[in-house]
Amino acid sequence: MTAGALVSGDVEDMRVSRVTISDVTFAADLSGALFWEEQRLLVVSDLHLEKGSSFASRGVLLPPYDTIATLGRLAAVISRHDPRTVIALGDSFHDRTAHERLSAEDRDAVAGLQSGRDWIWISGNHDPMLPRDLGGTVADEVAIGPITFRHEPTGAHGEIAGHLHPKARVSARGRSMERRCFASDGMRAVMPAFGAYAGGLSIRDAAFAKIFPKNGFVAHLLGDRRVHAIAASRCY
């Protein structure tokens, strides 16, 4: 599906639940995860666990429930897809000591999510030195077939990355809607942040132009019930 095909008709007719990158088709989950069914591989990005406690240490008080909320959402998406492998695509922890602030219950929750499956932590800019005591394996990037998984996008073909926390705003039927989104041109993709407090960056930011030339990409917005594919040129 091309961006040109997406700009005709009503926004409500542009609904998709699949994203194709370098001829590999992924299920785009409303949670912000991608699932590669053939590989039984689930990918999530930018969990930013313990962001609330990180802010609290600097005097910015947020409700201290982001980690439990994020892990709960992750448990739900794992239950839906039953992956053989999970890749956490960097910035899983908000800072270098965030893992030390996990409660015993949160550590048990992580162990439960890892049970019976392979788990890969990709290092990110927030967590370049990932802990070795939380199970799973640690890598800077992982290549499977034509797809390379890394945290920071380079614009390479076959790349799935995170880091930028894409979101998009669109108007339809007199209403404005801003949502997290996958950004993809079919050759590469940037995933939305999964974490409860992760926030987002507009796809109209110059950072995306470096990855997707001429705005020739699609924003796959996470709606209430399904994913909506909308040409980036229609977003603001």
Map each language-model feature to its residues.
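Extended recognition/assembly regions associated with phosphoester-bond processing machinery
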Residues: 1-236
